[in-house]
Amino acid sequence: MADQLSEEQIGEFREAFSLFDKDGDGSITTKELGTVMRSLGQNPTEAELQDMISEVDTDSNGNIEFKEFLGLMARKLRDKDSEEELKEAFRVFDKDQNGFISATELRHVMANIGERLTDEEVGEMISEADVDGDGQINYEEFVKCMMAKKRRKRIEEKRDHDGGSRTKSAGPSAAPASKRGQKCVIL
C-alpha cells in the first residue's frame, strides 16, 4: 500500500514522523500518532485514532514503526479519494441535485444499471439507509451506508486472507437477519 506513495510524499511523512521519533529508533508511540497526523493536515477524531492504532500496532507494543505509519497514511490518502468518489456517486443518484435521494431517483438509477426493482425493494432500500425517517436518503445517510459496506468488505477480506474456516456467508455480518447490510450493498 505504501508503494502507492510518491517519493515526495514519503519524504514529507518521514520528516513529520522523525520530529516525534525522539530517540531515532524508527518508531513513535501511539499517543504521538495524532500529533503527527495533525502536522500533516489530517484531523482524525479520537475514535478514528483508536481504530488506526489497533489496525497499525499489530504487536500491541505501543509503538508504530515508520513502515506501519506509511501504510496508514497511504490508506488515509486513499480514503480521502474515496470521499470524492462518494460525493460523485451521490450526485449520480441525486438527479434533481436537492441533496436527497428519493425512491424515484433510486429506482431510475438502478434501472439504468440493469437492476429492475419492485416498489417494495426500493422502499426497503430507502428505509434501511434512511436514519432520520424522512423517506429519503441524505448525503450523511448515504455515506454511513457505503462505509458500512466498505467495513463489511474489509472484514470479509481479512477473514478470507487469514484463512478462517468461516465462509463469506457465515457470521453476523452476512446473516439474513442483517437486512441493513444487504440493502446497502446494492447502493
UniProtKB/Swiss-Prot annotation:
Q: Where does Ca(2+) 3 bind?
A: D94, D96, N98, E105
Which residues take part in binding Ca(2+) 2?
Answer: D57, D59, N61, N63, E68
Cite the entry's keywords alphabetically: Acetylation, Calcium, Lipoprotein, Membrane, Metal-binding, Methylation, Prenylation, Repeat
Biased segments, Low complexity type: 169-178
Its cellular-component GO annotations read:
cytoplasm; membrane
Please tell me where Ca(2+) 1 binds in this chain.
D21, D23, D25, S27, E32
What topology does it adopt in the membrane? Lipid-anchor
Sequence positions bearing N-acetylalanine: A2
- Give the similarity note: Belongs to the calmodulin family.
Q: Name the chain's protein.
A: Calmodulin-like protein 1
- Organism listed in the record: Oryza sativa subsp. japonica
> Which gene underlies this protein?
CML1
